């Protein structure tokens, strides 16, 4: 340990744990030590109740010499976040009384994986007796970058996105990028912009626009131009738990071609005159018609929220308006003429319900403002805050032709989740229900259940994490369906392998190691088990499962999420995948669940 750092630690009072220092992770503690040494500060052991004299901000460089990263010179090309932009995000300012709950909330608010990999807020001794100062320590991730994310299996790229971006424009915490996205059937390119503080206010803006082109299977050259998509979000957020008013406006549109895939090929269905539905479109037929159609979709919402905060529980009531427009149609190259039986059969089997729903809604939310900080759960060493206790949401809306809807109906959405941290782990269970009521008929019921379990770190070496989801559709008038496969977490099977419009389940168990530090890198491994299926009803579900192993690599200076490489082996054969060797390899970012 360097002598200067050792001397600094000796100066820290034994009660530093009461100020939060002892709860910091390794990367955070190193950053705080750097900041204390840089400013000549000491932790204040007894800050509670004192008036804050000043809010000091230290934002460290991306690359530090002590980490022996051969890129320290690159710091000259990065503009660290300006101190006053960090300072104004603090819920505690000079003249306020020190409050540990607001310190924790400020830390959570400042956490943004695209901007910082370290955020720590601590009390420090002030030069004025009886006063305490607040120290905010952050460390930027590299912002001028070519961001990438991808999913691949063997030699086929399923999904790829790249953006030439400035994630922290001029150090103002604003994001601007040109974004390219490629999935199995489409390529898109367009500008993105995000501003969390418009003109220094609390207003938040996110906007994006994309031009769409066709992608032929396995090709990297764009095909014909097919349409556009966009999204726009303007919000006055509930920026603290004590905030009482919030509002938001959203708009999105899609005008392009929707495709369904079977593995790496377009799913094809036979148009043989046999009456079927979207729940039973018939088997994959290599000589059939490709599952693709043109889709125009528009979604808008306007909402005002009133919050009723109390120390033990937060209640919120929201009211607003929503518009959802969905119009499917045939592509120009559909092989059958207007009025043909084949067209009618294809529309019946493939198209979602064409509709325009305009509704006024009321929503009630309740949750407990209690949080726990985890580490080495979904990433390595970084702080991960999870809210504990109950979380309830009740929503009802009334759609009417008087406000532009093409039908009169009532919409319901409910959800309830419970999270706990017994024995130092994480336990979360929840469920949701949504439905439509038209007259006295209840339709389109969607019931979901979910569970997440995580042990504490065992023997300082590993953690066991499990998750499961189950869902059922009843009276499915909107032609919705479930899809399970390699892109939804069933890693041993191809994309879109299992489809059903009545029931689905997916479950995972992983044994994840703690990180091994290799110079400035973090390396971890895991073994896993997946199981899942989608079918026409619960009775038709089959237990398809796989086992495998994977690696996780984290470069803290560039990302707060890990690079993922998994190799899975199916235990049960499926139409698109034999059991056992050679299995299926996938690559991407972030954990699967």
Role assignments for model-derived ranges:
Residues 19-158, 162-166, 177-195, 215-232, ...:
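Periplasmic polypeptide-binding modules associated with outer-membrane biogenesis and secretion
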Residues 160-169, 187-207, 230-238, 300-306, ...:
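Feature captures outer-membrane beta-barrel proteins of Gram-negative bacteria and organelles
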